C-alpha cells in the first residue's frame, strides 16, 4: 500500500531472529525500502544462541541469506531431549 502512494517503508525488527531474516528479505524485495531498524544487542548476542548464520551488518548493510526459505539455519541442539530453555533478559 505504501508503494502505491510513493511512500518509503522502514521495518523495525525488534522481534525474534526469524523476524530479522524475514525483514531482511522484505527489504531486499521492496522497491520503496528506505531503512531497516534493528537492535544491535539482539543480533550480536541473542540471535546467535538460536541461529547459526545470523546476518551481521557490514558498514551499515545487511545481506539477506540466499539459503532456501528465509535462509535461517536454526540450531538443531535447541530441539534435543525435549527440554525448553528459558532465560529472562529484562
Kindly give the residue locations of the regions a language model identified:
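C-terminal extensions of enzymes
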Residues: 50-90
Amino acid at each position: 500500500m505504501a508503494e502505491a502512494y510513493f511512500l518509503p517503508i522502514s521495518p523495525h525488527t525488534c522481534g525474534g531472529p526469524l523476524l530479522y531474516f524475514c525483514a531482511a528479505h522484505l527489504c531486499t524485495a521492496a522497491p520503496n525500502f528506505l531503512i531497516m531498524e534493528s537492535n544491535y544487542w539482539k543480533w550480536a548476542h541473542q540471535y546467535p544462541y538460536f541461529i547459526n548464520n545470523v546476518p551481521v551488518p557490514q558498514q551499515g548493510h545487511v545481506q539477506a541469506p540466499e539459503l532456501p526459505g528465509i535462509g535461517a539455519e536454526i540450531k538443531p541442539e535447541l530441539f534435543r531431549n525435549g527440554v525448553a530453555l528459558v532465560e529472562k533478559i529484562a
